[in-house]
């Protein structure tokens, strides 16, 4: 398993393409140009586009080669739909999820993507109008991820189990729960994914949670308590950086800010107002670059 080539080993900084958009589909080459010019190491993409937009082997190879040309590593994120749910009581929903992921993982391998993060063990957005069976759903997720991890190992793609806040998920809300979960699955290619936005709601001490995760931490999302870019809110970034240094974190640290209301993204992320006064592309670029410089300075990595 590898995230980066040996000559560029170490934690790398990235950003999710959806910071600039209101929909989950985009021209990824455009955002490769942008994030490379801004100084990032990583662009995170949505896997939904690999089913609906980038559908051919030639297109996937083209994206891979363009990323290399720009000096970028690609990472991937996904929120499964309710119809393709690894923890479902419905065998058809589980079958559809397995089919989707077993088709997706070789595509990620072809693209030289080695981390897939998100609430992969369940579905998103979660329906809280029904009585969710946490223990039963957790057991089914463990069983099905054990099977799926074999394909992940063959494709050398780490599955990052994202720890979500109580308003977006119910199976994994804390790092402690995620540790037990990934240990029970028992695969080198199933790891924990932490997100500072969610951690701010659920963790008593964010830095301690990172240290507890240790080498189980496979992926990291960065964002303020209100989804702004790092450095524009109140999170304890110096403590977070120290914890990452303490565990010698070698993965990607990907910013996942959402600042625009409207569109599918604004609706699903629950952004009900514009979060910054200037939403011009130039201003968003400026904030992203400033956040990158802030993280590199404060984290010291």
Swiss-Prot record:
Reactions mediated catalytically: D-allulose = keto-D-fructose
The record's free-text note on cofactor binding: Binds 1 Mn(2+) or Co(2+) ion per subunit.
Cofactor(s) required, per the database record: Mn(2+); Co(2+)
Annotated active site: 162 (proton donor/acceptor), 256 (proton donor/acceptor)
InterPro entries tied to this protein: IolE/XylAMocC-like, Xyl_isomerase-like_sf, Xyl_isomerase-like_TIM-brl
Keywords: Cobalt, Isomerase, Manganese, Metal-binding
Reported temperature dependence: Optimum temperature is 55 degrees Celsius.
pH dependence: Optimum pH is 7.
Binding-site list for substrate: 16, 168, 195-198, 227
UniProt activity-regulation remark: Completely inhibited by EDTA and partially inhibited by Zn(2+), Mg(2+) and Cu(2+).
UniProt keyword Aminoacyl-tRNA synthetase present: no
Keyword check for Manganese: yes
Pfam families referenced in this protein's UniProt entry, alphabetically: AP_endonuc_2
Enzyme Commission identifier(s): 5.1.3.30
Residues binding Mn(2+): 162, 195, 221, 256
GO molecular function, one term: manganese ion binding
Family: Belongs to the hyi family.
Subunit structure: Homotetramer.
Primary role: Involved in the biosynthesis of D-psicose. Catalyzes the reversible epimerization of D-fructose at the C3 position to yield D-psicose. The enzyme is highly specific for D-psicose and shows very low activity with D-tagatose.
Record's protein name: D-psicose 3-epimerase
Biological source species: Enterocloster bolteae (strain ATCC BAA-613 / DSM 15670 / CCUG 46953 / JCM 12243 / WAL 16351) (Clostridium bolteae)
